[in-house]
């Protein structure tokens, strides 16, 4: 099934197209992938954005956190995904400490694009990353900012917890999102925040906001591939869902996920968080 050249049946997804989808009220469907085979399958299912996430440290390498993942590993897995030549836009994570300085950030983002073939990079961090985002934007590198729960800070945060439940924290996150947009971010990933805050930030920005555990009112949704296929060891996060339940095949599960996000059926209240926001 996956030998030879993968079929090209869709127009390529671009940054401009994602922005038009937000303007038109069409939900953006994103999903992680770490290899050629699943990149082909996701593209055929209609996924708009494939994220080569540093989550590979946990779901591929079996580590406890994403912190040990290296730039070399990200380049390798990004290259595997882009070998599928998907119509979906391929976004790659900047791993922990790969953008500790502006020079590091520029160099490693360039590696992910030149060596890995990524079309966008994603980096965690609040308003303090605005200068790097601006530098990357001036260099012609599309950027997805990442706010809310930031897995690379798990040791500082003391675990994986919902962020932005207090009013002051929610206001600060909205201000950070606006600062990152003003600096030149093309996309925002918002993780593990109250649904009301997800709505506020999505409505407060012109760029698309992709949620993961951020409620149904974001401009799109993203989940981890292994979670939606029900193969993640242990419990999956509350905001995720096993789409293999009732599906006859992996491809059917991927299509069910795409349809659920596109229609707005996912996430529902059971897969969202309450709180002040």
UniProtKB/Swiss-Prot annotation:
It comes from Alkalilimnicola ehrlichii (strain ATCC BAA-1101 / DSM 17681 / MLHE-1). This is 3-methyl-2-oxobutanoate hydroxymethyltransferase. Homodecamer; pentamer of dimers. It is found in: Cytoplasm. It catalyses: 3-methyl-2-oxobutanoate + (6R)-5,10-methylene-5,6,7,8-tetrahydrofolate + H2O = 2-dehydropantoate + (6S)-5,6,7,8-tetrahydrofolate. GO terms for molecular function: 3-methyl-2-oxobutanoate hydroxymethyltransferase activity; magnesium ion binding. Binds 1 Mg(2+) ion per subunit. Its EC number is 2.1.2.11. It comes from the Bacteria. Gene3D superfamilies: Phosphoenolpyruvate-binding domains (3.20.20.60). Pathway: Cofactor biosynthesis; (R)-pantothenate biosynthesis; (R)-pantoate from 3-methyl-2-oxobutanoate: step 1/2. Its cofactor is Mg(2+). Belongs to the PanB family. Mg(2+) binds at residues 54, 93, 124. InterPro entries: Pantoate_hydroxy_MeTrfase, Pyrv/PenolPyrv_kinase-like_dom, Pyrv_kinase-like_dom_sf. Keywords: Cytoplasm, Magnesium, Metal-binding, Pantothenate biosynthesis, Transferase. The active site is at 191 (proton acceptor). It is an enzyme of class 2 (transferase). Its main location: cytoplasm. Pfam families: Pantoate_transf. Catalyzes the reversible reaction in which hydroxymethyl group from 5,10-methylenetetrahydrofolate is transferred onto alpha-ketoisovalerate to form ketopantoate. GO terms for biological process: pantothenate biosynthetic process. 3-methyl-2-oxobutanoate binds at residues 54-55, 93, 122. Signal peptide: none annotated.
């Amino acid at each position: 099934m996956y030998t030879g050249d993968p079929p090209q049946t869709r127009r390529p997804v671009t940054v401009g197209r994602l922005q038009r989808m937000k303007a038109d009220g069409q939900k953006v469907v994103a999903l992680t992938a770490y290899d050629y085979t699943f990149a082909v399958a996701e593209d055929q299912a209609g996924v708009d954005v494939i994220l080569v996430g540093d989550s590979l440290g946990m779901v591929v390498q079996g580590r406890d956190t994403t912190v040990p993942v290296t730039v070399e590993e990200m380049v390798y897995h990004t290259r595997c995904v882009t070998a599928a030549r998907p119509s979906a836009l391929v976004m790659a994570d900047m791993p922990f400490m790969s953008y500790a300085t502006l020079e590091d950030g520029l160099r490693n983002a360039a590696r992910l694009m030149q060596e890995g073939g990524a079309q966008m990079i994603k980096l965690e961090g609040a308003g303090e990353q605005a200068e790097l985002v601006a530098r990357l934007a001036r260099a012609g590198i599309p950027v997805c900012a990442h706010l809310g729960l930031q897995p690379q800070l798990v040791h500082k945060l003391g675990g994986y917890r919902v962020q932005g439940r207090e009013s002051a924290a929610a206001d600060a996150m909205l201000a950070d999102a606006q600062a990152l947009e003003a600096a030149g971010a093309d996309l925002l990933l918002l993780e593990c925040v109250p649904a009301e805050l997800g709505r506020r930030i999505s409505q407060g920005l012109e760029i698309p906001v992709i949620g993961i555990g951020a409620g149904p009112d974001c401009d799109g949704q993203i989940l981890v591939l292994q979670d939606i296929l029900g193969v993640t060891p242990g419990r999956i996060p509350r905001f995720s869902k096993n789409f293999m339940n009732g599906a006859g095949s992996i491809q059917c599960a991927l299509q069910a996920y795409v349809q659920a996000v596109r229609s707005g059926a996912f996430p529902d209240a059971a897969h969202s968080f309450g709180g002040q926001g």
